[in-house]
Amino acid sequence: MKSIVYEKKLPKLTSLEIAKNSKKKVICGMSGGVDSSVSAFILQQQGYQVEGLFMKNWEEDDDTDYCTAANDLADAQAVCDKLGIKLHKINFAAEYWDNVFEHFLAEYKAGRTPNPDILCNKEIKFKAFLEYAVEDLGADYIATGHYVRRSDVNGQTKLLRGLDSNKDQSYFLYTLSKDQVAQSLFPVGEIEKPIVRAIAEDLGLITAKKKDSTGICFIGERKFKEFLARFLPAQPGEIRMVDGKVIGKHDGLMYYTLGQRKGLGIGGVKGLSEDPFYVVEKDLINNVLVVAQGNDNSALLSQGLIATQLYWVDRLPIRQNLRCTVKTRYRQQDIACEVIPLNDDCVEVRFDEPQIAVTPGQSAVFYQGEECLGGGVIERQIK
């Protein structure tokens, strides 16, 4: 198969490089989406022996509108048939439940806001999948449709941001070690999303115009509140201002996150301005949601954070203060900061400028230029 867009936009490999690649087997994770579809095609063009693997990581239930595994599998199979490659199938639902979902529930129960996509990458895509591909399928590499890049210079493997800054997914992959990165290929990380779609359209792939998934990893885009209530009992309570004034009722602390503005159910409050309210604290002991009014309210701001559960890509803990940038949530602009090691698994991060909505349970991910250094889980804010 040929793609005019691919021929024009992507660098051509030499015949020697293609011959070298032809001795390597790559198992490409096929999600039924456009990114993994085009990744498999690019790997073929680069000469690799390519096979696909579809992972089922969530058991179907009665949420037929949200669990799209059957449709995704059909799309993945159609793409593999079109490309002429074999598609393997594996069920990691038990691993997902034990290593991702139970942690997800425990964090919400503890009043934190976890990022299950990060844990899914750590425990499923780059652990269970990688081990299965190498040990059972004889892979030399795995490949995924993530928008990140890998750098190999002087024997040093590094994880870099994706070329398309609008789609960069390095934030979700900071737990990977340099060895895991070295065993992984990220074909679409070197190109921009519009080109990925154009290649898919060129090839007539069924996934060319398929909408990107934006739901929780492997759970889909169901109504989150209803979904969470099936696993954790809600405990309604009071909404109070920072000064203690009661201004409403909340549905359960687990449904709210720091910095949240929408969905608080607070209308106009007598004697107060029309400025919006923001969540600034979740008081678990008293089951109180604390809010502040105005987007420039000092209660929203943090001077820094404490992060634990650290993962550095090179797996070498820092021993001295580090100047770098940090993201405390996906799609955030880089924040200039200083990282101060407290021990091998805990750092203090001091921002150059105060930041809003620093949320315990989310991840702080560190960068130097294009390189993703690693990160950790936000334990608490520093006010």
Swiss-Prot record:
Chain positions of site Interaction with tRNA: 146, 362
GO BP terms: tRNA wobble position uridine thiolation
GO molecular function terms listed in the Swiss-Prot or TrEMBL record: ATP binding; tRNA binding; tRNA-uridine 2-sulfurtransferase activity
Reactions accelerated catalytically: S-sulfanyl-L-cysteinyl-[protein] + uridine(34) in tRNA + AH2 + ATP = 2-thiouridine(34) in tRNA + L-cysteinyl-[protein] + A + AMP + diphosphate + H(+)
Cysteines engaged in disulfide bonds, as pairs: 120-217
EC number(s) from the headed UniProt entry: 2.8.1.13
Superkingdom of origin: Bacteria
Keywords: ATP-binding, Cytoplasm, Disulfide bond, Nucleotide-binding, RNA-binding, Transferase, tRNA processing, tRNA-binding
CDD domains: MnmA_TRMU-like
Enzyme class name: transferase
Interaction with tRNA: annotated segments: 167-169, 329-330
Pfam families tied to this protein: tRNA_Me_trans, tRNA_Me_trans_C, tRNA_Me_trans_M
Residues reported to bind ATP: 29-36, 55, 145
Name under which the protein is recorded: tRNA-specific 2-thiouridylase MnmA
Example of a GO cellular component annotation carried by this entry: cytoplasm
Subcellular location: Cytoplasm
NCBIfam families the record matches: PRK00143.1, trmU
Upper classification of the organism: Bacteria, Pseudomonadati, Pseudomonadota, Gammaproteobacteria, Pasteurellales
Family, per entry: Belongs to the MnmA/TRMU family.
HAMAP family: tRNA_thiouridyl_MnmA
Region described as Interaction with target base in tRNA: spans on this chain: 115-117
InterPro entries tied to this protein: MnmA-like (IPR004506), MnmA-like_C (IPR046885), MnmA-like_central (IPR046884), MnmA-like_central_sf (IPR023382), Rossmann-like_a/b/a_fold (IPR014729)
